[in-house]
Amino acid sequence: MFEKKNLWIPFILCFALSIIGCKSKSGMAKKGSIEQIVPIKIDTIIQKVIVHDTVPKLSLGEHKVWTLGKAGIHANIRQETAIHYDVRKPNYVIIHHTAQNSLDQTIRTFQVEHTKVSSHYVISRNGVIVQMLNDYVRGWHAGLSKWGTITDMNSISIGIELDNNGKEAFPDAQIEALMVVLDTLKANYGIPAANFIGHADIAPARKNDPSVFFPWKLADRGFGIWYNPAELVTAPETFNPIDALRIIGYDTRNLKAAIIAFKRKFVVNDVSPELTIYDKSILYNLYQNY
């Protein structure tokens, strides 16, 4: 019995040595892996430390963006933050109505991921002005639109939303607050009077805002265009109303939509898709100023 046990000893020793050898090889493999991976991790950590702990001097371009960023925020009014935007210089102002029930609902709409829409300013019915995007930031308010030859209105415009459901008049307090914003934007960025327009102007087939209740005669104060009632005359037979609409800026590919948008703004009490003699006289008067 003793001799049989001794016969097993060499096999047991060999088995034990093979296990130790395997562990050693495994340990060496792990050690080799660590030697290859650790330097990469260290480099990554060092790079992160350099990025976070070093404050480099701003380049001219970065300094300009930083300066514009400061200039585009108006500290004396309430600030909220929208989440959908890009950066650009404004040269147009697009006026909208919210078609929602409250200021807070509109703000919330501009702060949730799935809506993919935003505006620079929202003005409440009682005249509270809320800035949601820096003036130099590209908002997402115009959507699919066209004005003249411009097909990306978001890139050159500031969007202003008026808290209004589209079926009611715009309160005086709201319009006066709007005037303050428009006057500031015009002074700060040199925006031409003709470049204050409505959402329906640039997207006539999709939008009707601001509604017919909006007082576009604010052109008297330098924002937008308006005709001179004292100078209305019958348009000559050679007058081409389609060309006139196009020259003003309307997208005439959908002519009926363009006519309705024009009449909703300048005629108001008749928004049919046909131009009457009176409508043409208004259009002709506007056309002469372009």
For the regions a language model picked out, list residue spans one by one.
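Hydrophobic helical h-region of N-terminal Sec-dependent signal peptides
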Residues: 11-17
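Basic/polar, cationic surfaces and motifs that engage anionic cell-wall
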Residues: 24-36, 171-290
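Bacterial N-terminal signal peptides that target proteins for export
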Residues: 2-9
